[in-house]
């Protein structure tokens, strides 16, 4: 069974949809880095049937967190290669403090095949806090929770773990200590 998106793309390509139903002057795509093969096929079908349609795709290839379900920033990159396309880098960050942004910039320089090339600049006054902690032991949770408790009044924190199991254990401990937490995990 095809998804609704794949079926719509197929119907448009085969001329099974009335032109007035798909005739658009502007198409805005938010979170374009999260497009998968089906969404891209639908976009291509709409573009092919609306030659004058203006496409505005907004996305951040560094924030593609849905690869596990088939999204690929390459589809957004392909749009930048279209004839007449214009690529605009938005480099000002109003959400994060200086240290996290600089840390992320350092990490992102090591990634191949990025669309953006200009480093991000924090526009906030706060310096922020970044700490990389590596533990060789399976008993890493308590020291990490204690460190987060020390910084809990200084803003939002993020913890990256190697496995989903580690993330679940850590979240339970944080909640036990009264720290509101949210689990974001892959489906692996």
Regions flagged by a language model, labelled:
Residues 1-31, 37-42, 57, 67, ...:
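Accessory N-terminal region flanking or inserted into the helicase ATPase core
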Residues 24, 84-86, 147-156:
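Short, surface-exposed connector motifs at secondary-structure boundaries
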Residues 93-97, 137-142, 187-188:
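A short acidic, often aromatic-flanked loop/helix-cap motif at beta-alpha or helix-coil junctions
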Residues 98, 158-188:
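Core RecA-like ATPase module of SF1/SF2 helicases and allied nucleic-acid translocases
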Residues 133-154:
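Conserved interdomain hinge at the start of the Helicase C-terminal
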């Amino acid at each position: 069974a095809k998804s609704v998106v794949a079926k719509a793309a197929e119907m448009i390509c085969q001329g099974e949809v009335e032109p007035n139903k798909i005739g658009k002057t502007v198409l805005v795509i938010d979170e374009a880095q999260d497009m998968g093969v089906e969404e891209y096929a639908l976009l291509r079908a709409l573009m092919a049937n609306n030659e004058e349609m203006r496409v505005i795709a907004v996305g951040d290839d560094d924030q593609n967190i849905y690869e596990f379900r088939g999204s690929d920033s390459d589809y957004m990159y392909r749009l930048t290669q279209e004839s007449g396309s214009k690529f605009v880098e938005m480099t000002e960050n109003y959400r994060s403090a200086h240290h996290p942004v600089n840390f992320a910039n350092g990490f992102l320089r090591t990634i191949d095949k990025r669309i953006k090339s200009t480093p991000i600049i924090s526009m906030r006054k706060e310096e922020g806090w970044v700490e990389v902690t590596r533990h060789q032991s399976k008993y890493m949770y308590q020291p990490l929770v204690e460190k987060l408790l020390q910084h809990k009044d200084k803003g939002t924190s993020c913890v990256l773990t190697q496995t989903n199991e580690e993330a679940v254990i850590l979240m339970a401990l944080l909640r036990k200590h009264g720290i509101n937490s949210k689990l974001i995990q892959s489906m692996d």
